[in-house]
Amino acid sequence: MKDFIFEPINTNTIQKCHELNEKNVPNVGSRSLKGLTNSLENSDYSECILFRDQVVGFVICFLDNEITKSYMEQIDHKNFREISNRVSNFLYIDRIAVDIEYRNKKLGSQLYSNIVDFSKNNSITSLTAEINLLPSINISSFEFHKKFNFYEIDTVKYSEDYEVSLQKKEIN
């Protein structure tokens, strides 16, 4: 882990985060570079993992507050809306990705540990996320989130080819 650098996403790393995001579709939703940059600019927590100046992982999160709700309404973010109708005082993990060559090295776990620390320091009581069921079920994400004591609070089917599992973890 000592060779990996964890730092906030910035203008120098957003392009590489976007490339990594697109390599992980359909496990994460596709976003344009402009859309991902817009998310970053409106996010409350972001972090990327660098290894030899290469982005090998990242996460972008949003707090449950009026500014975020307004932004999410503007971009019609259905998953955030569904979670905010069911949970309060949460940090929403909008997207996380780790390069396939760097998986099983505890990098995603370290990102989540950092998110938990941020949440505790900001009196946040829950972490939330969604996991794709359709167009393809993201089994590795279910297994990963289960290790962090996430549980399903509901499923939402938006169309014949898009369904998600809404997930929650209590912060102690």
Where would I find each of the regions flagged by the language model?
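A short beta-loop-alpha structural element at the N-terminal edge
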Residues: 2-19
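Conserved GNAT acetyl-CoA-binding A-motif
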Residues: 91, 119-135
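C-terminal "cap" of GNAT-fold acetyltransferases
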Residues: 154-172
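Conserved active-site alpha-helix within GNAT-family acetyltransferase domains
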Residues: 121, 133-154
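Conserved acetyl-CoA-binding loop-helix of GNAT-fold acetyltransferases
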Residues: 98, 104-119, 147
